[in-house]
Amino acid sequence: MSAVTSGDRRSQTAAIEQIVIRDALEFDFPTIIDIYNATVPTRMVTAELEPTTVEARLPWFREHSPDQHPFWVAESNGRVIGWLDFKKFLPRCAYRGTAEISVYVDEHFRRQGVARRLLEEAIGRGPSLGITTIVGLIFAHNEPSLRLFDRLGFERWGLLPGIARLDDVERDLAIMGRRV
């Protein structure tokens, strides 16, 4: 992996200002999986222990629908640089207005406002999707994500202590929630 110079960072930041958020297409899925797999070794974002494949995750991708539980990508200059998806929180009818969201950003574009833009879009468009409550499940040691959700009006609604075992370390899972 090459280092990012300050000149490279400026050009990436300029590109970030021109983000388009759109529905994900199957064509985007290999890039979506690459972004996801890059987080696996960090042990900060996902409970997956090994990278996954497009084939293994395609059924999950196909469960989304643009009108209720969309899957969006953030695109800049024709390149997918991040994504956000809505999932059913629980399968019971009374939870119909609650969605769990996940957001992932290409490692070269992190800390440049991509996740914030995706989350703001989710908050803003949630009601038109029939969503009244958004929940994010975030590892308690993932402080950057917790701070971002906090800045966007999410509150810590719960903590599941020691629920995930990553490399022989038990990790807590924070439940962040917000009405929209």
Language-model-detected regions and their locations in the chain:
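Conserved beta-strand-loop-alpha-helix junction that forms the acyl-donor binding cleft
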Residues: 110, 136-146
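Conserved acetyl-CoA-binding loop-helix of GNAT-fold acetyltransferases
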Residues: 111-124, 147-151
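Conserved GNAT acetyl-CoA-binding A-motif
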Residues: 126-138
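A short beta-loop-alpha structural element at the N-terminal edge
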Residues: 20-32
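Conserved GNAT-fold acetyl-CoA-binding loop/helix
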Residues: 33-60
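Conserved catalytic-core motifs of GNAT/GCN5-like acyltransferases
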Residues: 88, 135-138, 150, 155-172
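Acetyl-CoA-dependent GNAT
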Residues: 51-108, 119-120, 125, 179-180
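C-terminal "cap" of GNAT-fold acetyltransferases
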Residues: 18, 99, 162-180
